[in-house]
C-alpha cells in the first residue's frame, strides 16, 4: 500500500436520502440496490453517492453494525418517501484521504488512513463515510476513486 495523504478540511452539511443496513459493513451492497431502485422509481438524481458508517467495528458485533447507503440530494428532494429516510451529515472538520482501486481494497486504505491520522495527532469522533467519485458501471476497477471522510475533533 502506498502512503496515505491526509487532508484536514471543513465540510459543509450534506442532505442525504438513505437506506439503513444492519450487519457487516461489507454487505451494504444490498442497501445500495434498494436505494438505486427507489431513486430510479422516483426520478431523483443524486448529487453524490455515499456510504455512511455509524459504529466502530472494533467495539460493536458485526451483526449489529449500522450503516447507510446514501445519496446527497438537493433540498427539493430531501424528504422521507417510500423506503428512503431523509437525514443530514452535519458540517464539521474532517480528515479526508483517497482510495484508488477496487472497492475490495478499501479496508486496507481505511486502516492506513487511521494510522496516518494517529501519527498526525488527529482524533476521530462522530461520523465517517465514503464518497464514490466515479461510477463503477463505466470505470475499470483499478481506476475507481473513493474519498474517505472521518470527522475529527
Q: Which residues are covered by each model-predicted region?
A:
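A solvent-exposed interaction/effector surface
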Residues: 1-153
Amino acid at each position: 500500500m502506498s502512503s496515505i495523504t491526509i487532508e484536514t478540511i471543513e465540510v459543509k452539511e450534506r442532505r442525504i436520502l438513505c437506506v439503513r443496513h444492519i450487519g457487516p459493513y461489507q454487505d451494504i451492497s444490498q442497501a445500495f440496490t434498494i436505494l438505486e431502485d427507489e431513486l430510479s422509481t422516483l426520478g431523483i438524481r443524486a448529487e453524490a453517492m455515499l456510504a455512511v458508517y455509524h459504529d466502530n467495528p472494533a467495539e460493536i458485533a458485526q451483526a449489529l453494525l449500522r450503516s447507510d447507503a446514501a445519496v446527497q440530494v438537493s433540498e427539493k428532494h430531501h424528504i422521507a418517501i417510500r423506503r428512503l429516510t431523509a437525514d443530514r451529515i452535519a458540517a464539521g472538520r474532517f480528515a479526508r484521504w483517497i482510495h484508488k482501486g477496487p472497492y475490495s481494497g478499501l479496508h486496507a486504505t481505511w486502516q492506513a488512513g487511521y494510522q496516518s491520522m494517529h501519527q498526525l495527532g488527529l482524533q476521530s469522533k462522530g461520523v465517517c463515510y465514503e464518497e464514490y467519485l466515479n461510477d463503477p458501471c463505466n470505470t475499470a476497477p483499478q481506476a475507481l476513486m473513493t474519498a474517505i471522510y472521518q470527522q475529527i475533533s
